[in-house]
């Protein structure tokens, strides 16, 4: 196993997780459950391919993907914040909605039920001279940027306040609903970028191409105890397990079924180790009147 090849592949695999987990931290620190990351990523991936296909520019695809993630985030925000719907139920519904919507428009735009035509991407390989894909840099910087916002800015203080003590925050003039709307919007944009990277790295959209990555990202948020840097480290750990799975696939001495379950087994073990010890934001998932 080539260490350089392992590292470069691990980084590429980790980028969608890093984007989505960073967005998940922002939303959950404000008190909104982020089971919707899978749907945000899927919406971002599809919108990125549509934007790139019709414009010929991957940068337009990036903007389109951000809008795609934001679209589903706004549905999530309106239903859970304004109408006070159950956040877990809405999270499941958003993910199913994203699958249905992308499948419908895949057929409408590209006359296919499985995949889009190939589109222009950024390249995505790590060369000796550095990274040739700007989204790699953005993905690696996502967690430090979120950490700075959460812990070093007035907005971050408000996010933490409404996630822990919304009544106290409201009593000193902080609009809990406004802060949560913004936090969920940021979550949608960042998770959408995770989908953008995934789609443009593969140069096409395929049906349900996120394949559970949003759920692994939210697992990283929990494993990282709602800290963006720790969540990023968890993303790298899960990406390393996925890379190991890929590079061991040609090893006939190990049963293929065991190799395929390595990343998911690691997620289960990691979460089992923090259950009961990880303390979420006090107001996470609670309906605000």
Regions found by a protein language model. Give the residues of each.
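Alpha-helical transmembrane segments within multi-pass membrane transporters and channels
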Residues: 56-101, 141-144, 242
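Cytosolic-side transmembrane-helix boundaries in multi-pass membrane proteins
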Residues: 145, 154, 164-178, 248-289
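Transmembrane helix-bundle core of multi-pass membrane transporters
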Residues: 87, 98-153, 203, 207, ...
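Transmembrane alpha-helical segments in multi-pass inner-membrane proteins
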Residues: 205-264
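Hydrophobic core segments of alpha-helical transmembrane domains in multi-pass membrane transport
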Residues: 20-21, 45-49, 99-103, 138-148, ...
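Hydrophobic alpha-helical transmembrane segments
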Residues: 7-10, 14, 39, 43, ...
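Membrane-interfacial amphipathic/re-entrant helices at transmembrane-helix boundaries
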Residues: 1-20, 33, 47, 55-60
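Helix-loop-helix "hairpin" substructures at the membrane interface of multi-pass membrane proteins
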Residues: 57, 130-205, 228-233
């Amino acid at each position: 196993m080539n260490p350089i090849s392992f590292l470069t592949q691990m980084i590429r695999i980790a980028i969608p997780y890093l984007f989505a987990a960073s967005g998940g931290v922002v939303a959950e620190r404000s008190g909104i459950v982020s089971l919707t990351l899978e749907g945000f990523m899927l919406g971002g991936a599809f919108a990125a391919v549509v934007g790139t296909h019709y414009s010929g520019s991957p940068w337009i695809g990036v903007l389109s993907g951000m809008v795609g993630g934001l679209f589903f985030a706004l549905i999530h925000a309106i239903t859970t914040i304004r109408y006070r719907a159950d956040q877990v139920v809405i999270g499941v519904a958003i993910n199913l909605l994203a699958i249905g919507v992308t499948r419908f428009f895949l057929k409408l735009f590209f006359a296919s039920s499985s995949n889009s035509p190939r589109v222009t991407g950024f390249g995505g390989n790590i060369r000796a001279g550095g990274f040739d894909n700007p989204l790699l840099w953005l993905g690696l910087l996502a967690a430090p940027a979120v950490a700075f916002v959460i812990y070093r800015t007035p907005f971050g203080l408000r996010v933490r306040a409404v996630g822990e003590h919304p009544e106290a925050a409201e009593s000193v003039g902080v609009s809990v609903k406004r802060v949560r709307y913004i936090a969920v919007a940021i979550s949608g944009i960042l998770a959408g970028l995770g989908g953008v990277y995934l789609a443009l790295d593969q140069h096409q959209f395929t049906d349900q191409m996120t394949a559970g990555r949003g759920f692994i990202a939210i697992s990283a948020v929990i494993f990282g105890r709602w800290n963006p840097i720790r969540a990023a480290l968890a993303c790298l750990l899960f990406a390393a397990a996925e890379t190991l799975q890929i590079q061991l696939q040609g090893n006939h001495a190990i049963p293929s079924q065991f190799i395929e379950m390595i990343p998911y087994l690691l997620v289960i073990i990691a979460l089992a180790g923090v259950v009961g010890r990880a303390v979420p934001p006090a107001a996470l998932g609670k309906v605000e009147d």
